[in-house]
Swiss-Prot record:
Ranges for domain Fibrinogen C-terminal: 178-400
Gene Ontology MF annotations: enzyme inhibitor activity; identical protein binding; lipase binding; lipase inhibitor activity
Broad class of where this protein is predominantly found: secreted
Recorded name of the encoding gene: Angptl4
Species of the source: Rattus norvegicus (Rat)
GO biological process: angiogenesis; blood coagulation; endothelial cell apoptotic process; lipid metabolic process; negative regulation of apoptotic process; negative regulation of endothelial cell apoptotic process; negative regulation of fatty acid biosynthetic process; negative regulation of very-low-density lipoprotein particle remodeling
Site (Cleavage): R163, L164
Name of the protein described by the UniProt record: Angiopoietin-related protein 4
Transmembrane segments: none
Glycosylation sites: N176, N231, N237
Coiled-coil residue spans: 54-146
Amino acid sequence: MRCAPTAGAALVLCAATAGLLSAQGRPAQPEPPRFASWDEMNLLAHGLLQLGHGLREHVERTRGQLGALERRMAACGNACQGPKGTDPKDRVPEGQAPETLQSLQTQLKAQNSKIQQLFQKVAQQQRYLSKQNLRIQNLQSQIDLLTPTHLDNGVDKTSRGKRLPKMAQLIGLTPNATRLHRPPRDCQELFQEGERHSGLFQIQPLGSPPFLVNCEMTSDGGWTVIQRRLNGSVDFNQSWEAYKDGFGDPQGEFWLGLEKMHSITGDRGSQLAVQLQDWDGNAKLLQFPIHLGGEDTAYSLQLTEPTANELGATNVSPNGLSLPFSTWDQDHDLRGDLNCAKSLSGGWWFGTCSHSNLNGQYFHSIPRQRQQRKKGIFWKTWKGRYYPLQATTLLIQPMEATAAS
């Protein structure tokens, strides 16, 4: 039995993916994102295709040999028993027949075992191909998002457009393959599919077009990052439309966008994680259940006690007490005599202006003037009303994931 094509294909795949497999065995290290080149992805896809062809040929050859063994066993059985009226002298000697049958049965069991192993390998490779297809889609989306505008014209764009069909052909994808593999609904669904590395991924909530998000994979599952403040590189004093659509750098400071957040949470209850950090390196993690309304509710954050009291929510909603979102040009806060977003800075779920504001002005050091400090990033119940925080991150996850963990 020849297995050279399969072994050769496996060597090609091993050579192409050795770095990837070794990285999966170690905890992910924080390092600048590196996107695989098209040549590397072509080599990986070619190795996968060659391995798949080799396994398929090996299975077909094994099936043929199995059929031959079955025919030999049938012939042996007929020869051992002999038809009625056959001269006993023409039959296989009694001492030899059991040995022949036992030998054939041993070979048959061995072949069956090999076939089962091959089927498992083929199924494993199919799952791996599907996962690689998703990775390639994510890489394409990342390149489209992060490539400078001047590289997105002319030769570079045309060359990239020509390479995509070639990649799909190498890994055996049809033009409609992406429809068969819908992007995950959120980072938790991506986690359930086996992804364990944090980073940028494409998701597609129900009823929404696909878009890129930052996923943080933890032992508790996949969390979708919806906000990050860390260095003041992005101005968060934005309009209602900007907060609705999202802004910033997905690899740095950013706001995902209220409409995207609402599409992720949908009608499901979600868990909101709030990560806070002060200027002395101290950190605080808060988690509480939320519902997020649509634009018709001013994207109200619907809370239950005691969190509602902590954030100053007093409006009654079907899911508890609610806080509508406000910006300088869309005032929905609970202060009738003041626009909190104008008085402070940034858009936020303001109560009476004094409970929290994680989208406030970023200070690289704590200002001396109290009037200036109140415009900063603060969470009153942790560091007080006039302490501007150094860094914050907001993450969401569906409630069913929290209940299952």
